[in-house]
C-alpha cells in the first residue's frame, strides 16, 4: 500500500501534464490495488483528491478513458464513494462517453454509471439531469439483435445500469416507460434467452417496472406473455422459476395480459408444477406450489380468461381444479375453493356447477375444517358457496342439499373474514325463499349471534352483513314468529340504526323490515321501537333533502303503520309530521308525492 501513495502522487502530476505512458502505468497500478483491497484503496483515492482530476481524463480525446471509467466503476462499488463521484463532476463526462463507438469504453462507462446510481439518490439525479437513460435505451435498441458474447455482456451492463438507475423510484421508472424501454427489453429477452445473465437482468427489470400501473398497457402490447411462458418451460432451477413468478404476478393483474398468459399455455405449466410438487415436503417445493396455485387463481379473476378455462364446464383445467378440493393439501384446497368462487362469477357457470355436484364437494371440504380448521380454506369455501347461491334456480337446490346446516356450523367462529362470508352466504340463500328464511329466523342461536355481531364496531363488514341478514329474515319470511324471535333477542334497535346507514340499499332494507314489524307485530315491538327513537329518525329522514326518494316513500309507509301504537302515535303527533309530509306532496317523484297525500290524510284523520 506504500507504493499506492506514490502512485497517487505521481498520478496527480501526470494527470495534469498528460504524459501518456506514465499515466497508463499509474492507472494500471490503481486497478491492481483496487483488485487487492477495494475499500482501503477507495478511501485513499478519496483522501488524495484525485477524483476531481478524473473528469479531465474522461474526454473523448483521452486515450485512457476506458481505464479511468473502470477505476470509477470499481470505487463506486463502495457506498461512501458514490456522492464524492457526483461531487467531483464525473457524471456529465461519463454520460458524454456513452456516445463513443468503442465497446470497451461503453462497457466501463455503463458499469461506472450503474454503480454510482446503485441506491444513490444523488447519483440517479445527476444521471437523469445529464440525459444518460435515453442514450442507454437507444444503445439497447440498436445493439439488440447482435448475439456475440462481447455484445451480450455490454447489453447486460446497460440493463443493469437502467435497473440501478430506476430501482424503487416511481418517477424514474415512469420516465423509462415513456422512453419505450419495455418493448426493447421484451425483444432482448426473446433474442437472448440462451444468455443466463442477460435474461436475469431483463427479468429483474420487468419485476421493477411491472409494479407500475402505467407499464401494464405497454406490456400488453408486446409478446411478453409468450416469451415468459417459453422461458418458464425451460427452467428447472427453483430460483429462476421464482424470478419469473415475480414478474408474472404483477403482470397477471391486467386482464388483457391474463388472457395472453392463458393463450400462451401458462396454465398447463402451473398445473404441471402442482402435480409435481403436491406431495413434497421440501420448502422450495411448498413455496412453488403456493405461488403456482395462487397465480392460477389470479388468472381466473379476468372474465375472458376465466370463461376460456371454464369451457362450459368441460374444460380440462376446470376439471383439474375440481380435483384439488378433496385433496389433503391445504394450499390446494384453498386454491381450488378460490378458483370455484372465481368460476362462479356468472349465472350460467353457477347453474352448471351446482347441477354437477360442486356443492357437495365444498360442503365436504368445510366439514373437514369445522374444528380448529384452516381459516383461509373456510373463507374460500364459503365465498364459493355464496357466489353459487346467487342464481335464483340454485337456491332451492342448495337449501335441500343442506348448505344452511353446513354453514351454521361456523357460527361459533371468532374470525371476522369467516363471519362475513357466512352471513353473506345465508343472505343469498334465503333471498325470496320464505320457508328457509322462516326456519333460520326462528333459530334463536343464530339470531342472538347476529345481534351480537351487529355491535362489532371494529369490523364494519361483519356489522353491516349482520344487519342485512336480520332484515332479510323478516323481509323474506314475513313471519310473526321470526319477528318475535328478533324482538326477544334485542335486534330491533339494530334495524332502527340501520335505517340511518350511509348506504341507501341498507336504509331501504331496514325500513321495509320495520314496516313489516309494525304491520305484523307492533304490540310486541313498540317498546323497543320507542326506545330506539324510531319516530325521531323517520322525521329526520323525511326532512332531509338528501334522502333518496325510496327512503322518503318507505319512511311514510312506516309512519302510517306505526299509528296503531298509542305511544308511537303520540310521538308522531308531537313532532309535527304534517308540515314535513305536506311539503312532499309536490315531490318530483310520483310515488313519493302519492304516498305523501295518503300519509297526510292518515295523519289528519288520526290527529
Curated annotation (Swiss-Prot):
InterPro entries from the UniProt entry: ARM-like, ARM-type_fold, Armadillo, RAP1GDS1
| Keyword set, alphabetical order | Acetylation, Chromosomal rearrangement, Cytoplasm, Endoplasmic reticulum, Guanine-nucleotide releasing factor, Intellectual disability, Mitochondrion, Nucleus, Repeat
State any single GO MF term: guanyl-nucleotide exchange factor activity
Spell out which residues are annotated as carrying N6-acetyllysine: 230
Q: What does this protein do?
A: Acts as a GEF (guanine nucleotide exchange factor) for the Rho family of small GTP-binding proteins (G proteins) that stimulates the dissociation of GDP to enable subsequent binding of GTP. Additionally, appears to chaperone the processing and/or trafficking of small GTPases containing a C-terminal polybasic region independently of GEF activity. Targets include RAP1A/RAP1B, RHOA, RHOB, RHOC, RAC1 and KRAS. Regulates mitochondrial dynamics by controlling RHOT function to promote mitochondrial fission during high calcium conditions.
Assembly, per entry: Interacts with RABL3. Interacts with RHOT1.
What disease is this chain connected with? Alfadhel syndrome: An autosomal recessive neurodevelopmental disorder characterized by global developmental delay and regression, intellectual disability, hypotonia, delayed motor development, stereotypy, behavioral abnormalities, and dysmorphic features.
Q: What is this protein called?
A: Rap1 GTPase-GDP dissociation stimulator 1
Q: Which organism is it from?
A: Homo sapiens
Amino acid at each position: 500500500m506504500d507504493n499506492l501513495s506514490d502512485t497517487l502522487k505521481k498520478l496527480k502530476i501526470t494527470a495534469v501534464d498528460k504524459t501518456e505512458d506514465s499515466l497508463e502505468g499509474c492507472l494500471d497500478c490503481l486497478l491492481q490495488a483496487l483488485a487487492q483491497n477495494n475499500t482501503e484503496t477507495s478511501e485513499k483515492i478519496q483522501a488524495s483528491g484525485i477524483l476531481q482530476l478524473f473528469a479531465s481524463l474522461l474526454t473523448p480525446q483521452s486515450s485512457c478513458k476506458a481505464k479511468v471509467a473502470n477505476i470509477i466503476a470499481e470505487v463506486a462499488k463502495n457506498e461512501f464513494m458514490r456522492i464524492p463521484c457526483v461531487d467531483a463532476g464525473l457524471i456529465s463526462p461519463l454520460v458524454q462517453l456513452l456516445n463513443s463507438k468503442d465497446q470497451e469504453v461503453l462497457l466501463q462507462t455503463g458499469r461506472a454509471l450503474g454503480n454510482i446510481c446503485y441506491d444513490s439518490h444523488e447519483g440517479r439525479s445527476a444521471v437523469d439531469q445529464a440525459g444518460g437513460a435515453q442514450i442507454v435505451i437507444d444503445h439497447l435498441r440498436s445493439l439488440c439483435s447482435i448475439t456475440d458474447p462481447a455484445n451480450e455482456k455490454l447489453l447486460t451492463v446497460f440493463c443493469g445500469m437502467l435497473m440501478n438507475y430506476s430501482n424503487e423510484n416511481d418517477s424514474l421508472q415512469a420516465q423509462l416507460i415513456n422512453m419505450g424501454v419495455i418493448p426493447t427489453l421484451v425483444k432482448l429477452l426473446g433474442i437472448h434467452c440462451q444468455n443466463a445473465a442477460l435474461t436475469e437482468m431483463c427479468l429483474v427489470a420487468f419485476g421493477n417496472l411491472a409494479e407500475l400501473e402505467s407499464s401494464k398497457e405497454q406490456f400488453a402490447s408486446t409478446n411478453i406473455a409468450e416469451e415468459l411462458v417459453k422461458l418458464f418451460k425451460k427452467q428447472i432451477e427453483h430460483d429462476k422459476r421464482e424470478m419469473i413468478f415475480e414478474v408474472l404476478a404483477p403482470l397477471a393483474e391486467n386482464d388483457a395480459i391474463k388472457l395472453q398468459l392463458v393463450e400462451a399455455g401458462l396454465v398447463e405449466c402451473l398445473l404441471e408444477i402442482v402435480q409435481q410438487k403436491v406431495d413434497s415436503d421440501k420448502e422450495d417445493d411448498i413455496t412453488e406450489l403456493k405461488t403456482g396455485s395462487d397465480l392460477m387463481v389470479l388468472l381466473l379473476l379476468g372474465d375472458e380468461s376465466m370463461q376460456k378455462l371454464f369451457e362450459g364446464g368441460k374444460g380440462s383445467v376446470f376439471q383439474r381444479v375440481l380435483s384439488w378440493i378433496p385433496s389433503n393439501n391445504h394450499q390446494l384446497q384453498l386454491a381450488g375453493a378460490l378458483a370455484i368462487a372465481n368460476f362462479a362469477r356468472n349465472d350460467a357457470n353457477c347453474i352448471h356447477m351446482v347441477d354437477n355436484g360442486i356443492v357437495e364437494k365444498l360442503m365436504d371440504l368445510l366439514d373437514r375444517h369445522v374444528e380448529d380448521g384452516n381459516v383461509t380454506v373456510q373463507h374460500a369455501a364459503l365465498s364459493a358457496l355464496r357466489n353459487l347461491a346467487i342464481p335464483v334456480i340454485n337456491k332451492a337446490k342448495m337449501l335441500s342439499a343442506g348448505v344452511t346446516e353446513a354453514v351454521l356450523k361456523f357460527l361459533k367462529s371468532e374470525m371476522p373474514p369467516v363471519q362475513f362470508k357466512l352471513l353473506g352466504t345465508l343472505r343469498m340463500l334465503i333471498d325470496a325463499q320464505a320457508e328457509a328464511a322462516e326456519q333460520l329466523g326462528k333459530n334463536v342461536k343464530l339470531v342472538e349471534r347476529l345481534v351480537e355481531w351487529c355491535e362489532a364496531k371494529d369490523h364494519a363488514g361483519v356489522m353491516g352483513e349482520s344487519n342485512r341478514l336480520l332484515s332479510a329474515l323478516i323481509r323474506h319470511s314475513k313471519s310473526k314468529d321470526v319477528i318475535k324471535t328478533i324482538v326477544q333477542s334485542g335486534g330491533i334497535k339494530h334495524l332502527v340504526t340501520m335505517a340511518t346507514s350511509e348506504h341507501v340499499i341498507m336504509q331501504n332494507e331496514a325500513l321495509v323490515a320495520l314496516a313489516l314489524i309494525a304491520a305484523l307485530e307492533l304490540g310486541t315491538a313498540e317498546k323497543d321501537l320507542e326506545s330506539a327513537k324510531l319516530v325521531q329518525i323517520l322525521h329526520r329522514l323525511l326532512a332531509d333533502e338528501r334522502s333518496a326518494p325510496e327512503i322518503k316513500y318507505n319512511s311514510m309507509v312506516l309512519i302510517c303503520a306505526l299509528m296503531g301504537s298509542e305511544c308511537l302515535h303520540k310521538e308522531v303527533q308531537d313532532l309535527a309530521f304534517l308540515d314535513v309530509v305536506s311539503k312532499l306532496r309536490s315531490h318530483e317523484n310520483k310515488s313519493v308525492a302519492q304516498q305523501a297525500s295518503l300519509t297526510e290524510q292518515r295523519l289528519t284523520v288520526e290527529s
